[in-house]
Amino acid sequence: MTQSYFELFGLEAKFKIDLAKLENNFRKIQSESHPDRFVTAAAAKKLKSMQLATLANEAYQTLKQPANRAKYLLELQGVEAIAETNTSMPADFLMQQMEWREAIDDAKNAKDIAALDNLLITMQRESDELNTELSLLIDNNHDYPAATNTTRKLIFIDKVCIDIKKVIEKLEDSN
């Protein structure tokens, strides 16, 4: 059996994790598997250390981001959070998405960085609420279908935050 990303870092397979422990264990694995430590080692040992370093990096990137961590946890439960065939979202969330996109466009057209900053704060609050919800749904209730919808919302929020930051950066660069 293959080791899960959580096991690799000595963490319990939960949504709410100790990020400091994740960081420390990642750095420890990276240090132990660094290529400089295997300069004189046999080719097989070099390859194994490189594979471990690559796995640790992939696992770390997955677990440090809440949306990726939720998606991975759902996959461990046999649930595909981002299925090509499952793109439905609640109507109220779809309406909210359109309102957020309009607000971004309006602020961009008005070159209103303050409005974009406020929208970013709103999105971060929404993200925090979804993270709390995911912790309850996954860790406490084991309600994976509901966690799937919440994960998809969080992925959308993350994308919107990235888009807002890009717009802010462009506006700041043009000033």
Label the model's feature ranges:
Residues 1-175:
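C-terminal accessory/regulatory regions appended to core domains
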